[in-house]
């Protein structure tokens, strides 16, 4: 309950807005799901919107390795480069399942009871990288819910750079749905790994949080009496 009105609100992590693929209502990212080569495996083909057209996200090499039948009609990069998804698969999209992405922002959705949700993006500092882990808790003990967020995402194809701009963030809530991003010297959080989960954990009756990192030791941050870390 972010705004203290008695109902359940949502805090949702996402890729963030500092990545090659940027999605909006007018320029969505799409995923086409189908067994294109009829080998019993569902392929995933991604597109993004350029000048109003659905263009392939992945490189020619990656798509033709996944679907070798496309090599014959796309022998050269200059053959492949201008083609839309519809031109690549002229007869194969009508029965494909299409998923549409309209935003990559991490958001808060405030519950308006029977009137749906009001969606607002998290502050820009949290859009600089992906958010993989969230904890909502009254961290500074002022009676209002705060947000502890961490993430980064390194497991991408070489054509994309890693999403690695997050060192973890603490957002201090005002109890009305608003938040202030605590400075690192205030929060004590500075983690440059790929965080997959954050768990509240008490050690010797001292409350804190365990940050679980890919290919690294877990990191435990203890809350001080002032509620800082």
Regions found by a protein language model. Name each.
Residues 1-229:
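Beta-propeller-forming repeat regions
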């Amino acid at each position: 309950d972010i705004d203290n009105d008695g109902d359940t609100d949502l805090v949702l992590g996402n890729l963030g807005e500092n990545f090659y693929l940027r999605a909006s209502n007018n320029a969505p990212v799409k995923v086409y799901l189908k067994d294109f080569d009829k080998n019993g495996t569902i392929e995933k083909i991604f597109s993004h919107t350029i000048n109003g057209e659905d263009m392939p996200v992945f490189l020619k090499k990656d798509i033709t390795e996944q679907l070798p039948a496309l090599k014959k009609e796309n022998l050269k990069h200059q053959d492949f480069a201008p083609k839309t998804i519809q031109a690549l698969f002229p007869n194969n999209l009508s029965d494909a399942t299409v998923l549409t992405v309209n935003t990559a922002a991490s958001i808060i959705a405030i519950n308006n009871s029977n009137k749906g949700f009001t969606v607002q993006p998290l502050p820009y500092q949290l859009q600089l990288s992906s958010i993989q882990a969230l904890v909502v808790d009254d961290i500074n003990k002022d009676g209002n819910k705060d947000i502890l967020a961490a993430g980064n995402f390194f497991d991408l194809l070489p054509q994309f750079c890693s999403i690695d701009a997050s060192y973890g963030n603490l957002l201090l809530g005002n109890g009305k749905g608003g938040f202030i991003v605590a400075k690192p010297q205030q929060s004590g959080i500075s983690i440059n790994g790929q965080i997959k989960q954050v768990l509240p954990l008490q050690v010797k009756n001292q409350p804190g949080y365990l940050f679980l990192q890919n290919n690294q030791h877990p990191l435990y941050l203890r809350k001080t009496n002032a509620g800082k870390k």
